[in-house]
Structure formats: structure tokens, C-alpha cells
């Protein structure tokens, strides 16, 4: 049964937390063009160029960084919107503009700390008594508070852009496991799987989250923060069920970039073999139920591992196109009244299965492999060492600006959050250099 929903959006979704009253002559840009410019010119975005997406052991400069991954996700995002406008023109007025979806894809990773998941786990452990740490929560915090475009509201993005960046619309206190593991005797013994963070918004940023969702009805607010089924164990985190239409498009673009483009990195860097591809992905893709994959999976494997750049690119492009053109807008299975929440972009079931196969393959053969995990573990130790040192004597070791922020806040959790903000903003190289300065016996 189709639901008739008005696509007239309240002007409140284009509002910013601060009116600003900027001195700009003849500025005819849309709110979302301005959002995109702020993200693109931010220090947080620039730092992504020195945060690696896949930690291989190659000396080449071919590999993707968080920045190139974000650029590719942005291109995919605008491609998804373009094909949706053609495929389902009735949603044209509801779909995000190119500038808006570009903004979301460019900004989606800016909260990720150095050393990927290793850095995230380390900061979450060190912040376990102070609200935790999580990359998506940090992204929201950067754009709403930390990036110094404005004095108090970060980049001061439009409300719709902020809603689109919130992948997990609930506070961490709501999604966090009932029980946490016991702290380890020594940080070297920390197991990453025990301290993977819950997903959501920091409780200390609740006022900003409340502002974003203020135009929603009480029923929509309650539904938006609804959890999936309660986990079986008290040590497992909860996850939210819903997200906005814009966020669903951004997430698909991110997943395709991860599942397909990171696969390309792994092949070029010699991290996966053709046999691994055949056993770990090709055989399952052939049985995923999608006619395109069933017909072309043999030639895709040949082209990916032919050693010829143009053939590999053709295979990658073919898979991306097959996934992208299988996306459509579908009604959400709960009665949201706001159209931004009532509809989501989804892959057809067979293609969703295919993308999961690709993501699992990348995780198993690219992320969870020995050499990558060694780099992540090393990064985990570097981040914990830095946090321990800086929190032990912040007035001595923090840089002047960060020290001032630390002194401005009153309670211990807020002070620890300042240190987490400082460390998470570092690039891989910055963290490594500071660690050497603090702990190396070599005179610098």
C-alpha cells in the first residue's frame, strides 16, 4: 500500500544554529552550496589526506587515503541522486541537491581518528568513564562545535545537512552496552573487539542534537531514536533502526566506495590473490541472485587480476554501475510524518547481498589481515600512550590553544573530552611524531 506524503519541506531545514550575518557581496549560493564550501575548506577535511584508508605495506603512493575515499564517495553520491531523479522523477523535489549530497559524503569521515579502528578503540577505552569515543559522534561534534568557522557552532551547517550526517540518531548512553568489560591491567593487553564503541551522539552534545531534530513531531523523534532488537548479551551495544533519506544515500555511497574501490587498492597493493577472490567473493557473487553478476562474474575476475590497469578499471566501473543502478527509493516501514524520514534509498535485495559479499571480502582479506592489524595495534598503543601522557599533565604538555580549552571546562569528563578532541584530530604522522618526541630515547 503506497503512502501519500507531501514533499513540501519546512524552511527550518535550511536554517543554521547561528544566523551569522556574514559580510558577503552578491552571494547567491544556496544554503547547501555554502555548506559544501565550508566542509571543503576546513582543516578537518584537509587532514583526511594524511589518514590512511587501507594500511598496506607498500611503499607506493597509489593507496587511498580517507580524503580520496571521501571524494570517491561524493562522486558516487551525486551519481546515485542523478539516477534516482531519472528513475523515480516523483521524488525529484525531495531528493538532496548535488551540493547537499556532496557535502554529506565529503564530511562523513572527518571524525575518524588516526590509525583507523585501532585509534578509535584506543580513544574509546581511554574515554570509557567519560562518555566514550566514536568516529561518527566525533564527526557531528566537529561540524557543530569544534571546527573554528564560527566561535561556538563549528561549521554552522544547515539543519538538513546535519540530519544527513547523523547515521545513528540516539545518544551513546542509549546505545551503549549495559555492561562494559573490566579495564585491562596494562594497555598492551587491550583486545580491540572488547572495546569497539557504541554508535550514536555524545551525551555532552545532546543540546545540538536536540536542535537538529527540533522541527520533527514528537512521534517522529521517538521513532527516529528507536533501537533494533535488544542484543542477547548485556555486553553488546544496541543500534538504531532509522536514518534520513539523505543519510541513506550517503551511506550507500560510502559502502560502495568501501566494498569496491578499497578492493581495487588491495589488488594493486598485492594484498589479495585471484584464488582468494574466487573463494572469498566470486563464488558467492555468482549465487547472489542478480543476473548481471551471474553473467559477468567470470570476466570480472579475469579483468581485475589481468595486471592491466584499464581492464581492472573497467571491471571496477562495471561493478559500481551495477550497484548504483540497483538503488531505488522505498517507503520506511514505520509511519513517519516527515518525508525526510518516511523514505530511504535502498539496494534491491540481490544487490544488497552482493555488496555485503564485497564488504565482507574487503574486511576479511584487507582489513583483518596480519600486516594491517599490526599497524592498527601499533596505532592503538600510540594513541593510548599519548592520552595517558597528556591527561597526566595537561597544563604542561598540551599546546597553548588546547590548554586554554582544557582550563575553560569545569568537570573531569569535559576536560578528558578536550584531550580526546585534540588527539583524534591528529593525522597518522602527527600522532607518530608526537609519540617519538615524548617517548623516544633518541635525542630530537
Curated annotation (Swiss-Prot):
SUPFAM superfamilies, sorted: HD-domain/PDEase-like (SSF109604)
Protein name: Deoxyguanosinetriphosphate triphosphohydrolase-like protein
Record flagged with keyword Cytoplasm: no
Gene3D superfamilies: Hypothetical protein af1432
Family: Belongs to the dGTPase family. Type 2 subfamily.
NCBIfam families named in the record: antiphage_dGTPase (NF041026), dGTP_triPase (TIGR01353), PRK05318.1 (NF003701)
Record-level GO BP terms: dGTP catabolic process
PROSITE patterns: HD (PS51831)
UniProt cross-references to SMART domains, sorted A to Z: HDc
Alphabetically ordered keywords of this record: Hydrolase
A GO molecular-function annotation: dGTPase activity
One Pfam short name: HD_assoc
HD domain span: 66-259
Organism for this UniProt entry: Vibrio campbellii (strain ATCC BAA-1116)
Keyword Membrane: no
Amino acid at each position: 500500500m503506497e503512502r501519500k506524503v507531501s514533499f513540501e519541506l519546512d524552511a527550518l531545514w535550511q536554517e543554521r544554529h547561528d544566523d551569522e550575518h556574514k559580510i558577503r557581496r552578491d552571494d547567491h549560493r544556496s544554503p547547501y552550496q555554502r555548506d559544501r564550501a565550508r566542509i571543503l575548506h576546513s582543516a578537518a577535511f584537509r587532514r583526511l589526506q594524511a589518514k590512511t584508508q587501507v594500511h598496506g605495506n607498500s611503499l607506493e603512493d597509489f593507496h587511498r587515503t580517507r580524503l580520496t575515499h571521501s571524494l570517491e564517495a561524493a562522486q558516487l553520491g551525486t551519481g546515485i541522486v542523478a539516477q534516482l531523479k531519472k528513475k523515480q522523477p516523483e521524488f525529484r523535489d525531495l531528493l538532496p541537491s548535488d551540493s547537499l549530497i556532496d557535502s554529506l559524503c565529503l564530511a562523513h569521515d572527518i571524525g575518524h581518528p588516526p590509525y583507523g579502528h585501532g585509534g578509535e578503540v584506543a580513544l574509546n577505552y581511554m574515554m570509557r568513564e567519560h562518555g566514550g569515543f566514536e568516529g561518527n559522534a566525533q564527526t557531528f561534534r566537529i561540524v557543530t562545535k569544534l571546527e573554528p568557522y564560527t566561535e561556538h557552532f563549528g561549521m554552522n551547517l544547515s539543519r538538513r545537512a546535519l540530519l544527513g550526517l547523523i547515521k545513528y540518531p540516539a545518544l551513546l548512553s542509549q546505545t551503549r552496552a549495559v555492561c562494559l568489560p573490566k579495564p585491562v591491567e596494562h594497555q598492551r593487553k587491550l583486545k580491540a573487539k572488547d572495546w569497539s564503541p557504541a554508535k550514536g551522539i555524545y551525551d555532552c552534545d545532546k543540546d545540538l542534537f536536540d536542535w537538529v531534530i527540533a522541527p520533527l513531531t514528537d512521534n517522529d523523534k521517538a521513532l527516529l531514536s528507536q533501537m533494533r532488537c535488544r542484543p542477547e548479551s548485556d555486553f553488546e551495544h544496541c543500534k538504531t533502526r532509522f536514518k534520513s533519506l539523505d543519510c541513506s544515500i550517503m551511506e550507500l555511497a560510502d559502502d560502495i566506495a568501501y566494498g569496491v574501490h578499497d578492493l581495487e587498492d588491495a589488488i594493486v597493493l598485492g594484498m589479495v590473490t585471484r584464488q582468494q577472490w574466487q573463494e572469498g567473493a566470486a563464488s558467492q557473487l555468482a549465487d547472489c541472485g542478480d543476473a548481471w553478476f551471474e553473467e559477468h562474474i567470470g570476466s570480472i575476475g579475469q579483468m581485475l587480476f589481468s595486471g592491466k590497469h584499464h581492464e581492472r578499471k573497467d571491471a571496477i566501473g562495471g561493478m559500481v554501475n551495477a550497484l548504483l543502478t540497483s538503488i531505488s527509493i522505498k517507503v520506511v516501514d514505520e509511519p513517519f510524518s516527515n518525508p525526510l524520514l518516511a523514505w530511504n534509498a535502498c539496494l534491491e535485495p540481490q544487490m544488497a547481498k552482493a555488496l555485503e559479499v564485497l564488504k565482507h571480502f574487503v574486511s576479511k582479506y584487507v582489513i583483518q589481515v596480519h600486516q594491517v592489524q599490526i599497524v592498527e595495534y601499533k596505532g592503538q598503543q600510540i594513541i593510548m600512550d599519548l592520552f595517558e601522557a597528556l591527561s597526566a599533565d595537561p597544563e604542561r604538555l598540551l599546546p597553548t590553544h588546547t590548554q586554554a580549552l582544557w582550563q575553560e571546562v569545569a568537570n573531569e569528563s569535559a576536560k578528558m573530552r578536550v584531550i580526546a578532541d585534540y588527539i583524534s584530530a591528529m593525522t597518522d604522522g602527527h600522532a607518530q611524531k608526537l609519540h617519538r618526541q615524548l617517548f623516544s630515547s633518541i635525542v630530537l
